[in-house]
Amino acid sequence: MNLEILLYENRKAKLLNILKIGINPFKKFVSTGEIEEELGLVQSREDLLNIIMNTFDKDENIILPIIGGVGTGKTHLYWSLKKRLHFYNTFYISLENVYRKFYYNMYSEYIEEMGGGEVLRSITNKLCAEWGATERKFGFFHIADIDKVRNSAFEKLKSNFDNKIALNDVINAITSHQLDPYKRVEAERWLLGELMDIRDLSHLNILYDLKRKSYAYTMLKIIIENSELRSVIFIDDFEKIVSLMKGDKKSEEIFDPSWLYGEEHIQSPETRSAQKALDKILDLQKIKGLRIIITLKSIDALEEIKSIIREKNNQLLATMKEPIILSNFLENDIFQFYKENMKAFLKNNNYLEFFEEFPDSYFPLNEKILKYIHTCSQGNPREIIKFFIKIFNEIIFSNNNFDNILAYYENQC
């Protein structure tokens, strides 16, 4: 046995010892919008990412559908996109969990994503300056004329908002935040989306907190349109809207209550909430510079959404781009995916020299097993990772001989 082979065998033995500690390189296999995904992109996903970014560079107010079945990596794509869009506020909402209090939840996610109070203070300072806060009243302290600033803001913004009461209260909160030292703390709490009691609201001379949909929408529009960064909202599980609007399919009855009361009066609360949520999402198109990504599991679901939008406002369909199809992994993708994640695993365990010395090795698996996994999983990323977890768990925890484990999976091919 020559020296190179001996070195390789020693390196393999050390890698197996690291695995035997009980660490599975693929232990996490379901990506969520709340937990950051660290896995890299394979080449076919890189190409899709470039298409999305080019689309964002060309257009501002768009709806971009992404179609992908269960386990194809839609949420993983969100994390990869978020890392690439350095000059965007990119935030995630799942309609599986959030379709009630939509604007409030969206605003909360947006504020958290952009960094909270510090960035918010920068935006409110910029707004007050544009509204005339730099012009000072005469007097010992040369303070700004708050009423004049508020009137100026209202005149500049009123044509862009239907709810003038909400607009007036939002302006009060922003100007109090910057120009009134006695109300600054409460105003910042209000702007950050905290729920407030009547006493605090009265102190600010404001009727409602941001749980009120018109208030949350007004704040969203003002903050997004005046942020230094462009904005992307990634709305996952969009077909939830379709399923809720359909409601439960019932068998045909001799008497249908809708004949007497009308369809709108027999809808379930969930159906009405879904319709309202869709209306709110469509209203987001009025926010200048907001790019919207929606994910669905099928083209059929997208066509149903288009049909609903067509009935509500046919012009909005012009803002909807052709869908991007998130297909399963190609065979080359699984090799790249496996190598990249094994490399990350070795780096985290201070054993990157294995990868550096043997860059073409797929140890502890091999090409034959990787091809078997791709075939059995039909290229579905989630199913691929489940296979990896299963095989690595056997390597780590099973009493079976390592060579016998590999031989078993090789014989499945």
What spans do the regions from the language model cover?
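A short, basic N-terminal segment
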Residues: M1-L64, K126, E130, F138-I146, ...
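Phosphate/oxyanion-binding active-site loops and adjacent basic polyanion-contact surfaces
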Residues: E37-L48, G73-K74, V98-M106, Y208-A216, ...
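Short, surface-exposed basic-aromatic patches at helix termini and helix-loop junctions that form
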Residues: N54-D57, S80-Y88, D283-K286, R310-L316
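P-loop NTPase nucleotide-binding core
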Residues: N61-S227
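C-terminal alpha-helical "lid" subdomain
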Residues: S327-C413
